[in-house]
Amino acid sequence: MPSFDVVCEANMIEVKNAIEQSNKEISTRFDFKGSDARVEHKENEITAYADDDFKLGQVKDVLLSKMAKRNVDVRFLDHGKIEKIGGDKVKQVIKIKKGVSGDLSKKIVRLVKDSKIKVQASIQGDAVRITGGKRDDLQSVIAMLRKDVTDTPLDFNNFRD
């Protein structure tokens, strides 16, 4: 039986490339000359450093524009609160969402069951497996989920025939 998985994960290679491009632009921009503005990446966290709140906003704008150019959906990012560190400097931790949350997976299963399409949906850890008899049914489920779930970026992978 054909099946696929519904997941929520960013392309980490593109995220890393966007961070490197952001750091390169920040180091060459005139308004950041002499400041300690930078963006760091560890595991599923991005940390933006700047001299003040205004420059932190500028750093985040650069980062988000680079991510958009590299086709990384900014809905993957969960912005934390701005923290003061030594002197006037500030930082902000931005977490990268990974996996489909419990509430969202239940919502996806409910949407699939309510759609009356002949497929089954089952929650498997941080993914939702959709199984159906025909490939056309699976494609209609993908179209329906793209239309109905707009608050979280969904990826569809692990297609089996």
Curated annotation (Swiss-Prot):
<dbReference type="InterPro" id="IPR007551">
    <property type="entry name" value="DUF520"/>
</dbReference>
<protein>
    <recommendedName>
        <fullName>Nucleotide-binding protein Bphyt_3208</fullName>
    </recommendedName>
</protein>
<dbReference type="GO" id="GO:0005829">
    <property type="term" value="C:cytosol"/>
</dbReference>
<dbReference type="Pfam" id="PF04461">
    <property type="entry name" value="DUF520"/>
</dbReference>
<dbReference type="InterPro" id="IPR035570">
    <property type="entry name" value="UPF0234_N"/>
</dbReference>
<dbReference type="InterPro" id="IPR036183">
    <property type="entry name" value="YajQ-like_sf"/>
</dbReference>
<dbReference type="GO" id="GO:0000166">
    <property type="term" value="F:nucleotide binding"/>
</dbReference>
<keyword id="KW-0547">Nucleotide-binding</keyword>
<comment type="function">
    <text>Nucleotide-binding protein.</text>
</comment>
<comment type="similarity">
    <text>Belongs to the YajQ family.</text>
</comment>
